[in-house]
């Protein structure tokens, strides 16, 4: 990984998968210039989801969130690029789709907060934790994109 790059964890939730939005979401990250370094299609276990959402365990919506995330397959991904955590969050839109601007993923494709189709790390530290939870180090593929010099100075 280049010195000025960081990585983020992005997961397309079961509703995003069921609605056929996987390709559109990947396309947006690729077109922005970010590099995909890992991806898997998984039915996340309840234990994995409880670890992933441990910070929310005392919130009233926690049981429903774990059930929803366990209701179908998820596309788990790691993206790399300059300021990818912050920029990725902007691309996703607000957690509540009603507050998301048109042009964002949630602004374009979501209506309710309980079905907001995508998760993105909220900090570099969270990204590192989430990546290590969902992926083994050997699953992160390091390569140089032929588009790199056309995206970065």
Swiss-Prot record:
<keyword id="KW-0808">Transferase</keyword>
<dbReference type="InterPro" id="IPR036850">
    <property type="entry name" value="NDK-like_dom_sf"/>
</dbReference>
<dbReference type="GO" id="GO:0046872">
    <property type="term" value="F:metal ion binding"/>
</dbReference>
<protein>
    <recommendedName>
        <fullName>Nucleoside diphosphate kinase</fullName>
        <ecNumber>2.7.4.6</ecNumber>
    </recommendedName>
</protein>
<keyword id="KW-1003">Cell membrane</keyword>
<dbReference type="GO" id="GO:0006183">
    <property type="term" value="P:GTP biosynthetic process"/>
</dbReference>
<keyword id="KW-0597">Phosphoprotein</keyword>
<dbReference type="GO" id="GO:0005615">
    <property type="term" value="C:extracellular space"/>
</dbReference>
<feature type="binding site">
    <location>
        <position position="13"/>
    </location>
    <ligand>
        <name>ATP</name>
    </ligand>
</feature>
<dbReference type="InterPro" id="IPR001564">
    <property type="entry name" value="Nucleoside_diP_kinase"/>
</dbReference>
<keyword id="KW-0460">Magnesium</keyword>
<dbReference type="GO" id="GO:0050679">
    <property type="term" value="P:positive regulation of epithelial cell proliferation"/>
</dbReference>
<keyword id="KW-0418">Kinase</keyword>
<feature type="active site" description="Pros-phosphohistidine intermediate">
    <location>
        <position position="119"/>
    </location>
</feature>
<dbReference type="GO" id="GO:0045618">
    <property type="term" value="P:positive regulation of keratinocyte differentiation"/>
</dbReference>
<dbReference type="GO" id="GO:0006241">
    <property type="term" value="P:CTP biosynthetic process"/>
</dbReference>
<dbReference type="GO" id="GO:0001726">
    <property type="term" value="C:ruffle"/>
</dbReference>
<dbReference type="GO" id="GO:0005739">
    <property type="term" value="C:mitochondrion"/>
</dbReference>
<feature type="binding site">
    <location>
        <position position="106"/>
    </location>
    <ligand>
        <name>ATP</name>
    </ligand>
</feature>
<dbReference type="InterPro" id="IPR023005">
    <property type="entry name" value="Nucleoside_diP_kinase_AS"/>
</dbReference>
<comment type="function">
    <text>Major role in the synthesis of nucleoside triphosphates other than ATP. The ATP gamma phosphate is transferred to the NDP beta phosphate via a ping-pong mechanism, using a phosphorylated active-site intermediate.</text>
</comment>
<feature type="binding site">
    <location>
        <position position="61"/>
    </location>
    <ligand>
        <name>ATP</name>
    </ligand>
</feature>
<dbReference type="GO" id="GO:0006228">
    <property type="term" value="P:UTP biosynthetic process"/>
</dbReference>
<dbReference type="GO" id="GO:0030027">
    <property type="term" value="C:lamellipodium"/>
</dbReference>
<dbReference type="GO" id="GO:0045682">
    <property type="term" value="P:regulation of epidermis development"/>
</dbReference>
<feature type="binding site">
    <location>
        <position position="89"/>
    </location>
    <ligand>
        <name>ATP</name>
    </ligand>
</feature>
<dbReference type="GO" id="GO:0004550">
    <property type="term" value="F:nucleoside diphosphate kinase activity"/>
</dbReference>
<dbReference type="GO" id="GO:0042981">
    <property type="term" value="P:regulation of apoptotic process"/>
</dbReference>
<feature type="binding site">
    <location>
        <position position="116"/>
    </location>
    <ligand>
        <name>ATP</name>
    </ligand>
</feature>
<dbReference type="Pfam" id="PF00334">
    <property type="entry name" value="NDK"/>
</dbReference>
<dbReference type="InterPro" id="IPR034907">
    <property type="entry name" value="NDK-like_dom"/>
</dbReference>
<dbReference type="GO" id="GO:0043066">
    <property type="term" value="P:negative regulation of apoptotic process"/>
</dbReference>
<comment type="similarity">
    <text>Belongs to the NDK family.</text>
</comment>
<keyword id="KW-0547">Nucleotide-binding</keyword>
<keyword id="KW-0546">Nucleotide metabolism</keyword>
<keyword id="KW-0963">Cytoplasm</keyword>
<keyword id="KW-0479">Metal-binding</keyword>
<feature type="binding site">
    <location>
        <position position="95"/>
    </location>
    <ligand>
        <name>ATP</name>
    </ligand>
</feature>
<keyword id="KW-0067">ATP-binding</keyword>
<keyword id="KW-0472">Membrane</keyword>
<dbReference type="GO" id="GO:0005524">
    <property type="term" value="F:ATP binding"/>
</dbReference>
<dbReference type="GO" id="GO:0005886">
    <property type="term" value="C:plasma membrane"/>
</dbReference>
């Amino acid at each position: 990984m280049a010195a000025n790059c960081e990585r983020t964890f992005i997961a397309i939730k079961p509703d995003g998968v069921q609605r056929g939005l996987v390709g559109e979401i990947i396309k947006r990250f690729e077109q922005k210039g970010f590099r995909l370094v890992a991806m898997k299609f998984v039915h996340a276990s309840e234990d994995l989801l409880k670890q992933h959402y441990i910070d929310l365990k005392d919130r009233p919506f926690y049981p429903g969130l774990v059930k929803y995330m366990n209701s179908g397959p998820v596309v788990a991904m790691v993206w790399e690029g300059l300021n990818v955590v912050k920029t990725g969050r902007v691309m996703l839109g607000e957690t509540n789709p009603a507050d998301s601007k048109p042009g964002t993923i949630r602004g374009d494709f979501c209506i309710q907060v309980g079905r907001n189709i995508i998760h993105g790390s909220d900090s570099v530290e969270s990204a590192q934790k989430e990546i290590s939870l969902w992926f083994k180090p050997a699953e992160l593929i390091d390569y140089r994109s032929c588009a790199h010099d056309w995206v970065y100075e």
